[in-house]
Regions:
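Hydrophobic pocket/interface hotspot
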Residues: 31, 98, 149
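Acetyl-CoA-dependent GNAT
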Residues: 52-95
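Conserved acetyl-CoA binding element of GNAT-fold acetyltransferases
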Residues: 88, 93-105, 137
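Conserved N-terminal entry element of GNAT/NAT acetyltransferase domains
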Residues: 1-26, 40, 178-191
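Conserved GNAT-fold acetyl-CoA-binding loop/helix
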Residues: 39-59
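Conserved acetyl-CoA-binding loop-helix of GNAT-fold acetyltransferases
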Residues: 109-124, 147, 151
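Conserved catalytic-core motifs of GNAT/GCN5-like acyltransferases
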Residues: 137, 153-170
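Conserved beta-strand-loop-alpha-helix junction that forms the acyl-donor binding cleft
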Residues: 134-146, 163
Length: 191
């Protein structure tokens, strides 16, 4: 297992009818819009409604990206951005966390699910990761995402408490994800 694999800074991918690329400073306004939306941001850590602060965060993130520790993706459908998701906590060899997953409303189930699957495919196939470990977890009241995580092959490992409440922690070995992926692709007609 090569734990030093990295994505190029100009990484892009087209999969399941979506275009994916790494976030840059020009995306700050879109990210702030997503993360500060009261409904969309209900279960995530709060973000200030400050575009300049988000640009600063992205500049710091780009250092982690260059080191292969963090990848923040933006997803497009028909040339318009509609979602973000991340791979992070990659400082432990063979492991990663997927999160910060937010999608604009009004997109199909297939498109939303694809924005969750694609980063995992990148982690397992391109970065040679062996296990996803959700150390920060998913808020226990975010029942749809907890259920979704179980549906794609994640296993509950425990619960942790922070200022926003109780979070369910998960992990998922690569083989469990790939055991479920073909069925998900068939059910959702993802090509």
């Amino acid at each position: 297992m090569n734990t030093n694999k990295k994505l190029p800074s100009d990484f892009t991918m087209d999969k399941y009818g979506l275009h994916v690329r790494l976030v840059n400073e020009d995306d700050a306004e879109f990210i702030v819009k997503l993360r500060t939306d009261e409904k969309l941001g209900k279960y995530i850590h709060s973000t200030l409604p400050d575009i300049e602060k988000q640009k600063e965060w992205i500049r710091e993130y780009k250092k982690r990206e260059a080191d292969g520790l963090d990848y923040y993706f933006i997803f497009y459908k028909d040339g318009e951005p509609f979602a973000v998701n991340r791979l992070y906590h990659m400082d432990v060899p063979g492991r990663f966390t997927s999160g910060s997953w937010i999608c604009l409303p009004g997109h199909s189930t297939e498109e939303v699910v694809a924005t969750s699957l694609i980063p995992r495919i990148i982690a397992f196939e391109m970065l040679d990761k062996e296990i996803e470990y959700g150390v920060e977890g998913c808020h226990e009241d975010n029942k749809k995402v907890v259920k979704y995580n179980l549906m794609i092959g994640m296993h509950i490992k425990g619960r942790i408490k922070d200022v926003k409440g109780i979070y369910v922690t998960f992990d998922m070995p690569k083989e469990d994800f790939y055991a479920k992926l073909p069925k998900l692709e068939r059910l959702l007609n993802l090509k």
